[in-house]
């Protein structure tokens, strides 16, 4: 999986440990690691930088507001990214499926179980939630680092797999307990929203709320009303745009905090995402800005007074 070249390992180690680089240095480092000179910067697939940028922005950013747009870029790199994810995630995916599904199954049991079984279902829900959170903390961080190293050495551009990582956003579900403890508004303020984008902010809020209700099932499911609220939030929060933004939020929020103290690769991963986002956001702004004629409004001269 890892390159045998000492120079490549040395360069990769320097980039990962040097977390104080400017955005320009980060972008240059990313292109160098991908085997592309800063002058050429021609992405894989035969596309020019401009064509690839437009394609990337239309397939990653636009579906956040309109999930119905086809992901052509994702389809082109499906085989390679899927093979990477299979290899990098094989060590913990099999158990995480169990830890993810069991709490959801036990959520429905209070509706059909007799009162004498309610304490048992709550205990099992709490147990599976704790196991799931433990699996994520000690499994997903290593998977991301392994995935990043694989992409960097193989010369794969990071934005090509962001969509695939978003599809695996269920891995981040139980980490929301920390987000909720820090406050719901902190989550929403990470994404400045325009007036037209308020439904997206509502989806993010619903997703975080339903996750908090899911994790704290033994505490909150004391009445049928709370059970119904939880199921409604759980259903509303799983729209594609909420899942994608939610995964992006968690990755940006926690790659630079406690987990980064254990694995500096997380912060490198966060810096890569920020660098690409800055690069393509600036490009789109320059592309869409049009010079509009400035209308000079001259006030009429006052009439001479006699």
UniProtKB/Swiss-Prot annotation:
Subcellular localization: Host cytoplasm; Host cell membrane
Cellular component aspect of the GO annotation: host cell cytoplasm; host cell plasma membrane; membrane
Q: Which domain of life is it from?
A: Viruses
Q: Which residues cross the membrane?
A: 92-112, 120-140, 161-181
Q: How does it sit in the membrane?
A: Multi-pass membrane protein
Which cystines does this chain contain?
none
Q: Which UniProt keywords apply?
A: Host cell membrane, Host cytoplasm, Host membrane, Membrane, Transmembrane, Transmembrane helix
Q: How does it assemble?
A: Interacts with host RACK1.
Q: What is this protein called?
A: ORF-B protein
């Amino acid at each position: 999986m890892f390159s045998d070249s000492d120079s490549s390992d040395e360069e990769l180690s320097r980039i990962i440990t040097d977390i104080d680089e400017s955005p320009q240095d980060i972008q240059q480092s990313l292109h160098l690691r991908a085997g592309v000179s800063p002058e050429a910067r021609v992405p894989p697939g035969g596309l020019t930088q401009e064509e690839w940028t437009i394609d990337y922005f239309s397939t990653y950013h636009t579906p956040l507001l309109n999930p119905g747009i086809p992901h052509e870029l994702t389809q082109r790199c499906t085989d390679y990214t899927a093979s990477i994810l299979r290899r990098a995630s094989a060590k913990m995916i099999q158990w995480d499926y169990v830890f993810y599904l069991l709490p959801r199954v036990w959520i429905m049991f209070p509706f059909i179980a007799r009162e004498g079984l309610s304490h048992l279902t709550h205990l099992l829900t709490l147990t599976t939630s704790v196991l799931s959170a433990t699996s994520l903390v000690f499994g997903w961080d290593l998977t991301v680092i392994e995935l990043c190293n694989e992409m960097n050495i193989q010369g794969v551009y990071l934005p090509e797999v962001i969509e695939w990582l978003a599809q695996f956003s269920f891995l981040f579900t139980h980490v929301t307990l920390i987000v909720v403890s820090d406050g719901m508004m902190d989550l929403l303020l990470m994404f400045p929203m325009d007036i037209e984008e308020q439904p997206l902010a509502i989806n993010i809020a619903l997703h975080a709320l339903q996750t908090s209700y899911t994790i704290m099932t033994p505490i909150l499911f004391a009445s049928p009303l709370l059970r119904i609220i939880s199921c409604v939030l759980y259903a509303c929060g799983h729209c594609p745009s909420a899942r994608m933004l939610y995964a992006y939020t968690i990755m940006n929020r926690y790659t630079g905090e406690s987990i980064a103290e254990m694995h500096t690769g997380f912060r490198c991963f966060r810096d890569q995402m920020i660098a690409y986002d800055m690069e393509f956001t600036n490009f789109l702004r320059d592309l869409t800005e049009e010079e509009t004629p400035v209308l000079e409004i001259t006030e009429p001269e006052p009439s001479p007074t006699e």
